Each structure stands twice: as C-alpha cells, then as structure tokens.
Amino acid sequence: MKIQIKGMKQLSNKEMQKIVGGKSSAYSLQMGATAIKQVKKLFKKWGW
C-alpha cells in the first residue's frame, strides 16, 4: 500500500507503520486515515 500526498514522496509500509504506531491493523488504519486528514488540513491551511 502506497499513499502519496501532493508533492510528498510516497510512504512505504514501514514508514506508515512508524507513523501510526504499528498497533492493531484496524486501529492503525483508522489512526493513519485521521493523521492523513489532519495533514491535508494543514496543507490546505499552508496553501499547498
């Protein structure tokens, strides 16, 4: 699974696991999705 955010390099599974803390899959995916939403909000705020 690769996730790409505008203008950022793709994140590998290992990097994603670090970001979401590598907890249980469902929890990690939920937290990952939440984190991505927050990041996208920040990017909008910064005009990216």
UniProtKB/Swiss-Prot annotation:
InterPro entries: Bacteriocin_signal_seq. Residues 1-25 form a propeptide. Keywords: Antibiotic, Antimicrobial, Bacteriocin. It comes from the Bacteria. GO terms for biological process: defense response to bacterium; killing of cells of another organism. Signal peptide: none annotated. The beta chain sequence is shown. Active plantaricin A is composed of an alpha chain and a beta chain. This heat stable bacteriocin inhibits the growth of closely related Lactobacillus species. It may act as a pore-forming protein, creating a channel in the cell membrane through a 'barrel stave' mechanism. This is Bacteriocin plantaricin-A. It comes from Lactiplantibacillus plantarum (strain ATCC BAA-793 / NCIMB 8826 / WCFS1).
